Regions:
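Carbohydrate-active catalytic/glycan-binding domains of CAZyme proteins
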Residues: 1-127
């Protein structure tokens, strides 16, 4: 597979739609262009209905792309105090073969180590 650029998954702030998944692309890693006309690419309606700190990995076993993020949503009125002391207990996981059609998996109580074991299987040892 030949790579022709970079894809950046991110959120843009604490506004109502700011805590969702946005994509930007770059050919050189320095100059970025918002995709989807600057609108969210993925919007969560489960858990706290927010998406923060998304990142993309590729499953080396099946070639699928996986986007993982927390469901923390400051815009919902929860506030930073609650976020710091109560945290967020959910991880949102999307899967895709092409990063165009995305499938949302159950967000509640994903065990993040299982996801990384598929991705970094040869680096993880022990139980």
């Amino acid at each position: 597979m030949e790579y022709t650029g970079y894809l950046f998954a991110h959120f843009i702030g604490e506004a109502q739609l700011g805590e969702q998944v946005y994509f930007a692309s770059s050919r050189d890693g320095l100059h970025w262009k918002d995709l989807n006309a600057g609108n969210p690419v993925l919007i969560s309606d489960i858990g706290e209905k927010g998406v923060r700190d998304p990142f993309i990995i590729r499953d080396v076993l099946n070639g699928k792309y996986i986007i993982i993020a927390t469901d923390l949503c400051i815009a919902s009125g929860k506030g930073w105090w609650s976020a710091q002391y109560n945290g967020s207990t959910n991880i949102i996981v999307w899967e895709s073969k092409d990063l165009v059609k995305m499938k949302l998996n159950n967000a509640f109580m994903h065990h993040i180590l299982k996801i990384f074991m598929n991705f970094l299987m040869h680096f993880i040892s022990g139980g």
